[in-house]
């Protein structure tokens, strides 16, 4: 019982630290911007939607800090031994499977009538039209999320659910979906979380 409580506490800590870093960095960037340009606090709410450069910068910085903290503390598993074995067939299968979940995720979205909020969708589109935004969304953020949700959270869940890996994978995928904060991303992130969780379980590597 003590072991269960300890593992749950660690998982809770990982989630809190991950979210706290995002919030603190966003407010630090936004606050600094408002002070520098002598803008009223009322502008804070829509600042990230209107200023894509600020959004990209805060996203990159918060992700890099997340990676640094989790690796420095030893909270995440990040072995490259599996990648060194050149498992190209497995990696190719994972890429194909990742592309393959797009159709069922779209189908589920249509079935449950869930859509990403318009402002958020527009923000992502604008970010993807910026080279640094593309790097942030396509490379840095996913790597930070893998460090946290597979390298740290799933690793603890696999210890907690010893002998029941699919329970651990499913729970970590649901947590991954919930953290994204809206129903549309919840479906996509949860399905992707199952795939990436399975890969982590089979390989012991987030890469």
Predicted region positions:
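Juxtamembrane helix-loop-helix connectors linking adjacent transmembrane helices
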Residues: 42-49, 75-147, 154-160
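Functionally important transmembrane alpha-helices
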Residues: 23-27, 31, 185-207
């Amino acid at each position: 019982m003590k072991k269960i409580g300890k593992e749950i506490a660690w998982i809770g800590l990982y989630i809190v630290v991950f979210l706290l870093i995002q919030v603190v960095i966003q407010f630090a960037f936004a606050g600094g911007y408002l002070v520098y340009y002598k803008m009223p606090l009322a502008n804070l709410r829509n600042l990230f939607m209107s200023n894509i450069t600020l959004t990209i910068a805060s996203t990159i910085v918060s992700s890099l800090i997340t990676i640094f903290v989790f690796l420095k503390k030893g909270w995440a598993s990040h072995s490259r031994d599996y990648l060194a074995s050149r498992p190209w067939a497995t990696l190719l299968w994972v890429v194909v499977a990742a592309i393959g979940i797009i159709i069922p995720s779209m189908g589920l979205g249509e079935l449950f009538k869930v859509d990403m909020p318009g402002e958020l969708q527009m923000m992502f589109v604008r970010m993807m039209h910026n080279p640094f935004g593309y790097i942030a969304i396509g490379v840095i953020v996913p790597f930070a999320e893998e460090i946290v949700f597979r390298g740290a959270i799933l690793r603890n869940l696999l210890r907690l659910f010893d002998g029941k890996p699919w329970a651990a994978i499913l729970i970590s995928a649901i947590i991954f979906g919930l953290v994204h904060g809206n129903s549309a991303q919840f479906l996509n992130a949860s399905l992707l979380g199952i795939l990436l969780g399975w890969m982590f379980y089979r390989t012991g590597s987030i890469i």
